[in-house]
Design a protein with these regions (language model features):
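Short, mixed-charge, low-aromatic patches
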Residues: 14-22, 80-86, 129-133
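Conserved A3 ("GATE") glycine/threonine-rich loop of ANL adenylate-forming enzymes
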Residues: 79-81, 142-155
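Alpha-helix initiation and N-capping motif
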Residues: 10-14, 122, 146
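N-terminal glycine-rich flavin-associated loop
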Residues: 17, 41-73, 98-140, 155-160
Length: 160
């Protein structure tokens, strides 16, 4: 946070996040936040909140709320990273958990591409492609079929 900004009213901030995505999709309880400060191998500081958007509109409004407050933002796929991919050492970070964004938007058999949301798992994608006699040229990340496509693509992208 910049020195010239006034302190954040976290109660209002969390209420705005809840308006963006629904209160059931905002986690602020310290015990519930603890797993979001860890991956399979590393441990860091837990975020101050986890937000689970379910639509692109919810992602946009949530990102706007977080950036307007001057806080750190980290995106998380399935939480199966083993290289600190979504972890941060900052005290003021909000994590976007992308698992609710799990729609396969398009499978284009002619041009051989798919369009998926970030929370689609490699297993989910494989299951959708298999009846068509198709598959991806790889099976996802080393953390397995239940890792998300968005998480796999974003691997090592923190701070970029």
């Amino acid at each position: 946070m910049d020195a010239d900004k006034s302190p954040i009213d976290y109660e209002d901030f969390f209420a705005t996040l809840a308006q963006n995505v629904g209160p059931e999709h905002v986690i602020t309880d310290k015990t519930a936040l603890s797993p979001y400060g860890k991956d399979i191998y590393y441990e860091s500081k837990p975020p101050i909140a986890v937000v689970r958007p379910g639509t692109i509109k919810e992602v946009c409004s949530t990102v706007q709320t977080i950036t307007a407050a001057g806080l750190c933002l980290s995106a998380r796929g399935g939480g199966l990273s083993y290289s600190a991919g979504y972890l941060t050492d900052r005290q003021d970070c909000v994590t976007l958990d992308m698992q609710r964004l799990n729609e396969i938007i398009e499978i284009n058999q002619d041009d051989m591409y798919v369009r998926v949301q970030a929370g689609v798992t490699w297993n989910q994608l494989n299951d959708a492609l298999e009846p068509l006699g198709l598959r991806t040229p790889f099976w996802g990340t080393g953390s397995g079929l239940f890792a998300t496509v968005g998480g796999g693509i974003s691997q090592n992208a923190i701070n970029y």
